């Protein structure tokens, strides 16, 4: 915190004025008195300034609007994204590395244009229904500002159009009473933070901490321009070798590559999160939080919550198609590893930016309530066997934009305290 040092006119200043007055005689006595009075006034003003400065460093209020330590405490307030004006990102190297080849012609044809209008309208309706159900469950819902993402912008290093304000999980992470803006890694997402600034400024004024991670330049050096991608097998080999489209030129990360369990936060090195970004988070959150790197057998690592989703104290969903290499860490801590069933989303349903495993991308309202897709009956039954009641909402069309319930939300406030689940 920047402090302002207060300068006060002390006893030496008064002695100096008295000396001057006695030497110059009565002709300047009035001047001396006025000067002394001015000094006293300045001192009082300085003290008032200090009081204002002290006020700026007061402790956070007990009713801070931002407070969340994990993924399962009772949910009180959440940000839900918007599908309005969502645009297909330009087909750049980082987009190519994060999408499947069957969709590449779609990006090449429509990059910079809006997603199909009919599909967007259906997605908007689904998310509105999701918001209504959350409100009925007693959750306060906040929404980002609507923005025209088709506008072209240019920096000294690149030019692009935008993507959307649909997935607050990708750009925001709440750790305790602090809300952190992720720097992101796609050029199409460079200005995505603008959609959330109205909300974040409100939280800040009401007592929350607000941190913006270092913004990358997204210059060519951040990306391996010759990243070889031709097949899923290529991706498996590259990921196994620790090779990703993002380099270590500068820190970058998406918030959705992190998942919280009290004092322990887990993160993967992915196509959008590099080691410099992870190290920035590790240093920023130390010593209160411990950041652990985990990895998976995943040909396209991007965002952890459709691969490894912590849903309760000692309870985690682990994608059977992408096994965790560090799963013994959780087993030794006594955690229960749950394997979700294969998703049943049809093969012909468009998933331009994700896989079918969005079925496990669920939002916990508390330890015993989960928001799950109404079409995914197998995973509903799995939760019921775990003693968790399901709140069913259909967001199939919203899935096409790259996210499930966890992605479409950022939990701002959960009723709970900071605890350790690994000590």
Curated annotation (Swiss-Prot):
Instruction: Tell me the Gene Ontology biological-process terms attached to this UniProt entry.
Output: creatine biosynthetic process; learning or memory; muscle atrophy; positive regulation of cold-induced thermogenesis
Protein's UniProt keywords contain Cell membrane:
no
First and last residues of the transit peptide:
1-43
* EC category: transferase
> Where would you say this protein principally sits, based on its record?
mitochondrion
Modification type N6-acetyllysine: residues: 385
Location of Phosphoserine modifications: 46, 49
- Might you give the EC number(s) for this enzyme? 2.1.4.1
Q: Which reaction does it catalyse?
A: L-arginine + glycine = guanidinoacetate + L-ornithine; 4-aminobutanoate + L-arginine = 4-guanidinobutanoate + L-ornithine; beta-alanine + L-arginine = 3-guanidinopropanoate + L-ornithine; taurine + L-arginine = taurocyamine + L-ornithine
Q: InterPro entries per the record?
A: AmidinoTrfase
The pathway entry for this protein reads as:
Amine and polyamine biosynthesis; creatine biosynthesis; creatine from L-arginine and glycine: step 1/2
Localisation per UniProt entry: Mitochondrion inner membrane
The catalytic residues are 254, 303, 407
Instruction: Please give the family membership noted in the entry.
Output: Belongs to the amidinotransferase family.
This chain's function reads: Transamidinase that catalyzes the transfer of the amidino group of L-arginine onto the amino moiety of acceptor metabolites such as glycine, beta-alanine, gamma-aminobutyric acid (GABA) and taurine yielding the corresponding guanidine derivatives. Catalyzes the rate-limiting step of creatine biosynthesis, namely the transfer of the amidino group from L-arginine to glycine to generate guanidinoacetate, which is then methylated by GAMT to form creatine. Provides creatine as a source for ATP generation in tissues with high energy demands, in particular skeletal muscle, heart and brain.
According to the record's subunit comment, the protein's assembly and interactions are:
Homodimer.
Put simply, this protein is called Glycine amidinotransferase, mitochondrial
Name the source organism.
Answer: Bos taurus
Q: Which gene encodes it?
A: GATM
């Amino acid at each position: 915190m920047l402090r302002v040092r207060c300068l006060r006119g002390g006893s030496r200043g008064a002695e100096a004025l008295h000396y001057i007055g006695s030497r110059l005689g009565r002709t300047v006595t009035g001047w001396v008195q006025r000067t002394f009075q001015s000094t006293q006034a300045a001192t009082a003003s300085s003290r008032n300034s200090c009081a204002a400065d002290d006020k700026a460093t007061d402790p956070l209020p007990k009713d801070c609007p931002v407070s969340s330590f994990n993924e399962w405490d009772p949910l009180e307030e959440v940000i839900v994204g918007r599908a309005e004006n969502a645009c297909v990102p330009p087909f750049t190297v980082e987009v190519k590395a994060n999408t499947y080849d069957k969709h590449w012609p779609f990006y090449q044809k429509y990059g910079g244009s809006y997603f199909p209008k009919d599909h967007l309208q259906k997605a908007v309706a689904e998310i509105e229904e999701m918001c209504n159900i959350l409100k009925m469950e007693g959750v306060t819902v906040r929404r980002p500002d609507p923005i025209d993402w088709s506008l072209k912008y240019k920096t000294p290093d690149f030019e692009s159009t935008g993507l959307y304000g649909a997935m607050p999980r990708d750009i925001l992470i709440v750790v305790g009473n602090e809300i952190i803006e992720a720097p992101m890694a796609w050029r199409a997402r460079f200005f995505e933070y603008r959609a959330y600034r109205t909300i974040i400024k409100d939280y800040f004024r009401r007592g929350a901490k607000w941190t913006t991670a270092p913004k990358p330049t997204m210059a060519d050096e951040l990306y391996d321009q010759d990243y070889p991608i031709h097949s899923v097998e290529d991706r498996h080999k590259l990921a196994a070798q620790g090779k990703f489209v993002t380099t270590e030129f500068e820190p970058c990360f998406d918030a959705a590559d992190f998942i919280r369990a009290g004092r322990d936060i887990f993160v993967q090195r992915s196509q959008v999160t590099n080691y410099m970004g992870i190290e920035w988070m590790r240093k920023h959150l130390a010593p209160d939080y411990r950041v652990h790197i985990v990895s998976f057998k995943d040909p396209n690592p991007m965002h952890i919550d459709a691969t490894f989703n912590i849903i309760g104290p000692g309870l985690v969903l682990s994608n059977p198609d992408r096994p965790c290499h560090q799963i013994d860490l959780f087993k030794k801590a006594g955690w229960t590893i749950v394997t979700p069933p294969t998703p049943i989303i049809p093969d012909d349903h468009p998933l331009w930016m994700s896989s079918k495993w969005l079925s496990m991308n669920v939002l916990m309202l508390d330890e015993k309530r989960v928001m799950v897709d109404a079409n995914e009956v197998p995973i509903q039954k799995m939760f019921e066997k775990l003693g968790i009641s399901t709140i069913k909402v259909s967001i199939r069309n919203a899935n096409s934009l790259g996210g499930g319930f966890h992605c479409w939300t950022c939990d701002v406030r959960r009723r709970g305290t900071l605890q350790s689940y690994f000590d």
